[in-house]
Regions:
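Conserved substrate/cofactor phosphate-moiety recognition/catalytic segment
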Residues: 6, 11-69
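Short, acidic loop-to-helix structural element flanking the phosphoryl-transfer center
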Residues: 181-212, 220-235, 261-267
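Substrate-recognition/cap helix-loop segment adjacent to the acidic, metal-dependent catalytic center
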Residues: 208-211, 218-255, 272-275
Length: 320
């Protein structure tokens, strides 16, 4: 077999592990710091040894020129070509991949405190992706690569992902606050927005949509409201609507970026997708803020602004 060094690079959760499996099946020796430990220079030394027997594939993130240099140097030393496979998975797709992987492996969306104790390189806090984006340097032939190939990301859902849902923001979408704060801190402060019940019932009963809720509740982290009060407000909102909407909420605030559950991050969406095997292209997110729209985009949901959505008289044919 022809000797070569293949560096597979891209965001965490970009799909590198899936791609490297094809190379291993072909007889390539995989070198990965998450498996062997050590530094990139240690991997380079291992590559130096392994190349005596055949081709090598490496699949860590390799975000900058410095992180790739020692591996390329091994190729030059042995006059062996070094090929770069650059996974063009976007930041947003990598975020969703990370959340889906997390839910599939642990059954839940990990919280900031979980990342302090977990020992799995495939389960990482959101700051890892932001750091990669910050330090990333585009690979070039000038570095010493003999070839650079772009690998597009194509998301494919399994045949079990067939269900659809209406995902709803709460504050500003279903209700307003009559209290001193922008968001209700007690059920008595909830004022329902008009024309909500009828359309939601039509989507649920006539068109067969699940009704799910996704909300940011940073007041919990700020200390202006308790988690118990927030949940009482959700339950009272559902009671006023006459519906049992399953809701998930984020209690954290930014900065810092510490969780995947705060919209526009796709964590809550990933949780719903996995739990109910949703087909995102058949789902609709309804909200009133840019964060809601970005959340929908990252999850692959359709999006409608609350004012536009609740102006509908019935479920449109395209969504039946």
């Amino acid at each position: 077999m022809k000797k070569e060094i293949v560096i597979i690079m891209g965001y965490n959760a970009a799909g590198k592990s899936t791609l490297v499996e094809d190379f291993v099946k072909k007889g390539y020796k995989r070198l990965n710091r998450d498996v062997s430990g050590g530094t990139v220079d240690d991997l380079a030394k291992n590559a130096d040894i392994v190349l005596a027997h055949g081709p090598v594939v490496l699949d860590n993130t390799y975000p900058d020129v410095k992180s790739r240099a020692s591996i390329i140097a091994v190729g030059k030393k042995h006059n062996i070509p070094v090929r770069c496979l650059w996974l063009k998975t976007s930041f947003e797709d990598a975020q969703l991949n990370a959340c889906l992987r997390m839910v599939r492996k642990t059954g839940k969306l990990l919280q900031p405190e979980d990342f302090k104790t977990i020992n799995d390189p495939n389960l990482f806090p959101p700051v890892a992706l932001f750091h990669y984006r910050k330090i990333f340097q585009t690979p070039t032939l000038k570095e010493g690569f003999d070839q650079i190939e772009d690998v597009p990301f194509i998301r494919q859902w399994g045949p079990e992902y067939v269900n659809r849902a209406l995902i709803l923001d709460y504050d500003g979408t279903l209700r307003l606050s009559t209290g001193a704060q922008k968001y209700p801190s007690a059920p008595s402060e909830i004022q329902m927005l008009p024309n909500r019940n009828g359309l939601l019932k039509a989507f649920a009963k006539d068109a067969g949509y699940m009704l799910l809720g996704a909300s940011n509740q940073s007041g919990i982290a700020r200390g202006s409201v308790t988690a118990k009060a927030v949940e009482e407000c959700f339950e009272h909102t559902n009671k006023m609507l006459g519906m049992n909407i399953e809701y998930q909420y984020c209690p954290h605030r930014i900065p810092p970026v510490s969780c995947y559950c705060r919209k526009p991050h796709p964590g809550i969406g990933a949780l719903f997708i996995e739990k109910y095997k949703l087909n995102p292209s058949k789902c609709i997110m309804v909200g009133d803020m840019t964060t809601d729209e970005t959340f929908a985009e990252r999850c692959g949901f359709n999006y409608m602004d609350a004012e536009q959505f609740f102006a509908l008289k019935e479920v449109p044919l395209k969504w039946r």
